[in-house]
UniProtKB/Swiss-Prot annotation:
GO terms for biological process: tRNA modification. It is an enzyme of class 1 (oxidoreductase). It comes from Anaplasma marginale (strain Florida). PANTHER family: RHODANESE-LIKE DOMAIN-CONTAINING PROTEIN 7-RELATED (PTHR43268:SF3), THIOSULFATE SULFURTRANSFERASE/RHODANESE-LIKE DOMAIN-CONTAINING PROTEIN 2 (PTHR43268). This is tRNA uridine(34) hydroxylase. The keyword Repeat does not apply. CDD domains: RHOD_YceA. Its EC number is 1.14.-.-. Belongs to the TrhO family. It holds the Pfam family UPF0176_N. InterPro entries: Rhodanese-like_dom (IPR001763), Rhodanese-like_dom_sf (IPR036873), TrhO (IPR020936), TRHO_N (IPR040503).
Length: 277
């Protein structure tokens, strides 16, 4: 077991790429990770890969060298963060119809919008002509978002297409749209969907919120609050460190680390409120 003193390296990554043999890839990836003490979740689909894993510095390095043996996954870029506590309880490799589930067919997810570098994001979205859309779920948005961003109020990514169609009803197709999410994959797929609706000026934050927080330092940025993450850290602060300021959604009291480890889908409640729920 990795010592707490050493800490854990957390790597989040994705790539939209045709993986015709993704079924065969599952046991190979799972065996590799288990043999090196790597834990987390890897999602495989015909349209690509999406994952967040954690382990020692050496094991994570070996994992990406392992991916390099596949031409389709070579040179994978990933977002790195760190934690003193183990972020995942087990290693899972899941086979899915979509690498991130939007729930619809009929559009090419490779026809994404244009990237905006984190260093240029604040200036770009400050224009009154830019509509900034948060593509995350409502329980994520509650913890933090970019100032002035539109919250679709969706409880899952599958609800986004219906919201987007309704939002688009009274919008000109040359409307400028900027989208963001946690690590980049949902907003990237969302831009492809918006383009399928006819929007021409569609942009998204490169690497998502996590990359932004790593790149743009200081209290004068447009980011407000904490960033929800899908592991036992639950949320990270502006320094991409595990948040120590998470509040119970029912009583607004402080939630400690032992409470956080049992949280799912943003149901962030202290022990007393969970007993009463």
């Amino acid at each position: 077991m990795l010592s707490v003193a050493m800490g854990y390296v957390i790597a989040a990554f994705y790539r939209f790429v045709h993986l015709h043999n993704y079924y065969d890839m599952k046991p190979v990836i799972l065996e590799f990770c288990l043999s090196r003490g790597i834990k987390g979740t890897v999602i495989l689909a015909e349209q690509g890969i999406n994952a967040t894993i954690a382990g020692s510095r050496q094991s994570i390095g070996e994992f990406f060298s392992f991916l390099d043996s596949d031409d389709r996954l070579r040179g994978m870029k990933y977002h790195e963060s760190h934690s003193d506590r183990e972020p995942f309880a087990k290693m899972k490799v899941r086979l899915k119809r979509e690498v991130v589930r939007l729930g619809i067919d009929g559009f090419d997810c490779s026809l994404r919008g244009e990237y905006i570098d984190p260093r240029d994001w604040d200036e770009f979205v400050s224009s009154p002509d830019v509509h900034v859309i948060d593509t995350r779920n409502d329980y994520e948005v509650r913890l933090g978002r970019f100032k002035g961003a539109i919250d679709p109020g969706t409880s899952s990514f599958r609800e986004f297409p219906e919201w987007a169609r309704n939002w688009a009803l009274d919008k000109e197709r040359d409307t400028c749209v900027a989208m963001y999410c946690t690590g980049g994959i949902r907003c990237e797929k969302s831009t492809a969907f918006m383009r399928s609706l006819g929007f021409r000026n569609v942009y998204h934050l490169r690497g998502g919120i996590l990359n932004y927080l790593e790149t743009v330092r200081g209290d004068d940025s447009l980011w407000e609050g904490e960033c929800f993450v899908f592991d036992d850290r639950i949320a990270v602060d502006r320094n991409v460190s595990p948040s120590e300021d998470i509040k119970c959604i029912k009583c607004a009291g402080e939630v400690d680390a032992s409470d956080l480890r049992s949280v799912s889908k943003g149901n962030i409640m202290c022990w007393d409120c969970r007993l009463q729920a």
